[in-house]
A protein has these predicted regions:
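Long beta-strand-rich cores associated with HINT superfamily self-processing modules
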Residues: 461-490
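Aromatic- and charge-enriched surface segment that lines or borders ligand/interaction sites
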Residues: 56, 80-123, 219
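Periplasmic-binding protein-like
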Residues: 265-309, 359, 443-448
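N-terminal lobe/hinge region of extracytoplasmic solute-binding protein
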Residues: 35-85, 115
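Extracytoplasmic/peripheral linker and loop segments enriched in polar/acidic and small residues
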Residues: 22, 376, 399-463
């Protein structure tokens, strides 16, 4: 988690002053990812990938399919695929590719790697989303089949995620490959060459590096960085204070979860009625206005609009009541619950950046109006709430509800889990959607999660970048960045 010292604006100014010290290689595009961990090829079975690892794996360890600049699916190791009419079988035909050591890529290699992801010992964060995968089978040397226990229309989007990137002996198949060349300390140089018959080869050369937010913003403002990836709500105010063209700041229209989840079983939040009062008295419109992200809308439901197979979720009954009236009633209810001489103090675990300060101030004001004090979690005040800020890997609504199953949350609903299990095994789309809606309604009724909006993901895009596009999954390939994007459908 990024840490922002108090004089962060001075830090950016100093970095801007010294930013021009490095000579730019005009041939390479300089891409920076916000984060402290360097970009390294990792094994997703070992657990969560850092932001820089996600970007690197997306670009050097393609799966059967991969994302294009717009977040659409394009061929990866598989040159084509076919889905059975019942949605229970995906058959992929591999291209004539090779591993970096020169060995031909065989279907049995891919089947083994994907099966390893599904094993109980795997800590791959994508494993739960693949619960409907019954078997991965190599049918011939170049044909592989993924068999499902129930239809999953979003399977291709899952297979394109960096967590399902395929590596052998620590190396992937591209499209970019690490190369040796002089580069900034901590950076990794990546190259992709596409051979063109009767024309010059297409060449992508990228220097990829991870750095703290202040450094990435300074590098971009000074012209040292062509592209910055990985921005969130927490560091967004830093960009707004820097002298950067408004057109350079780009937001991904992501789906996902951005809100508060219970951090422990005990404490005041064990009371469902108190959780409900807190949920009803947040001024989400004011929070969204303070974040000032184009297209960002306040959200009071676990599910969001536009998810696969679901109508827009019904809004809670209380949402039609003006916020002032909600607070007035909640103030009375809190005094009845606690008594005038027993005020409630809640602690929240948040990042340390300026965006989190905006969020904390808004929540403290909203809940202070009903007689509840909010403080930052520390050694004395254990967290009652913590922040969830996660982008959905696809448009599947199942991911939203399964984020709150009993195996991962301290407070949960057995009834909601049962509905999730029924949704996982349902073979009819309407039945599956009904079970997911049931699970979401149970979870919302108990206020185990307090939704605020969709996540915020931003990038800084320089003038040398022509092949960048915002997309719903916030995944950005580093090939073709210096080529103008074709219109959709071309």
């Amino acid at each position: 988690m990024a840490r922002f010292p108090q004089p962060v604006i001075l830090t950016i100014a100093v970095l801007l002053a010294i930013g021009g010290c490095r000579d730019r290689n005009n041939d390479a595009l300089d891409v920076m990812v916000i984060g402290d961990a360097a970009p390294t090829i990792a094994d997703p079975a070992d657990g969560l990938l850092s932001p820089a690892q996600q970007v690197l794996m997306l670009n050097v360890a393609q799966g059967l399919v991969r994302f294009d600049a717009r977040g659409q699916i394009e061929p990866g190791l598989a040159e084509r695929w076919n889905v059975s009419d019942d949605g229970l079988s995906y058959v992929f035909r591999l291209g004539a590719g090779k591993w970096p050591d020169g060995r031909s890529i065989q279907a049995r290699d891919i089947a083994r790697l994907l099966t390893r992801t599904l094993r109980s010992a795997s800590r791959n964060p994508a494993k739960d989303a693949l619960g409907a995968v019954a078997e991965v089978v190599a049918m011939t040397d170049r044909v592989i089949e993924i068999r499902l226990s129930a239809p999953r229309p979003n399977l291709l989007q899952l297979l394109a995620q960096p967590e399902l990137g395929l590596t052998r002996e620590g190396l992937g198949t591209g499209p970019l490959q690490p190369v040796e060349r002089t580069r900034p300390r901590g950076a990794i140089a990546l190259l992709h060459v596409e051979r063109i018959i009767n024309g010059p080869d297409k060449r992508d050369l990228v220097d990829l590096i991870a750095a703290p937010t202040a450094r990435t913003i300074a590098a971009f403002a000074s012209g040292e960085a062509d592209l910055v990836l990985g921005g969130t709500f927490d560091d967004l105010p830093l960009v707004r204070r820097a002298k950067i063209a408004r057109s350079a700041l780009r937001f991904d229209p992501v789906a996902g979860l951005f809100g508060l989840v219970l951090a422990r079983r005990g404490g005041p939040l064990a009371d469902q009625e108190l959780r409900s009062l807190l949920n009803r008295t947040i001024d989400r419109d004011a929070l969204v206005a303070a974040l000032a992200v184009p297209g960002l809308a306040p959200r009071a439901t676990l599910l969001q609009s536009g998810l696969e197979g679901l109508a827009p979720p019904a809004q809670p009954d209380w949402s039609a009541t003006p916020i002032a009236a909600r607070r007035m009633q909640a103030f009375t209810d809190v005094r009845t619950m606690t008594g005038a001489d027993a005020p409630i103090t809640l602690a929240i675990d948040l990042p340390d950046g300026p965006g989190a300060r905006i969020l904390f101030d808004r929540l403290a004001a909203d809940w202070g109006a009903i007689g509840i004090k909010l403080v930052r979690a520390d050694k004395i005040n254990p967290a009652d709430f913590k922040l969830v800020d996660a982008v959905a890997p696809s448009a599947s609504p199942a991911w939203f509800v399964r984020s709150f199953r009993c195996t991962v949350r301290p407070l949960c609903s057995i009834e909601a889990d049962a509905a999730m299990d029924s949704a996982r095994t349902a073979t009819v789309a309407d039945q599956r959607a009904a079970f997911i809606r049931e699970a979401s309604q149970i979870l919302e009724g108990k206020s185990f999660f307090i939704p605020l909006a969709a996540p915020v993901r931003w990038s800084l895009v320089g003038t040398r970048i022509e092949g960048f596009a915002e997309n719903i999954v916030a995944r950005h390939p580093l090939t073709g960045l210096n080529e103008r994007l074709k219109r959709e459908g071309q």
